[in-house]
């Protein structure tokens, strides 16, 4: 059963979204607080095909440790009205594997995400949280002119949301773990469509 989280003073981003009439927030992942949650999400049937992390909780704990120690990325928990519902990894593209597949600029950012709670499927929530996290990355560093993505070509639902979130397909690339669509979201276009 989902429980509303305690009031959180350590939110990295929080904004009411009038399209879904709910507040979308992000906070840094905390291992002790979020381990069981992330483990449960990684073992959800809808998450396994993309993330391939259906593993024992000890493996997820090690994965969290690696991510928290990695200077090129930060893990976040996404919340809707205070309830945890998604996991995000924000990364600096130039320092990521993806940076070898296109001419990455120093401040290009990217993200990986999963919606862990099936109760949040539908009702326009996924595009809203994608736009919110993309906005967060643009706000987090004014030098970021582009947010990039590399969803699997098999991630049809996510690819369907891309245009509604100002992401433009650049072509397909073969990454070590998947065939992916290279997607760019330019700051200027995002601001024109959604504002900051």
UniProtKB/Swiss-Prot annotation:
Listed name of the protein: Rhizobactin siderophore biosynthesis protein RhbD
A single GO BP:
siderophore biosynthetic process
Please provide, alphabetically and separated by semicolons, the GO molecular function terms listed in this UniProt record: N-acyltransferase activity
Give the UniProt keywords, A-Z. Answer: Plasmid
Q: Give the organism, scientific name.
A: Rhizobium meliloti (strain 1021)
What domain of life does the native source organism fall in? Bacteria
InterPro entries, sorted? Acyl_CoA_acyltransferase, Acyltransferase_MbtK/IucB-like
| Pathway as given in its UniProt record | Siderophore biosynthesis; rhizobactin biosynthesis
What family does the Swiss-Prot or TrEMBL record give for this protein? Answer: Belongs to the IucB family.
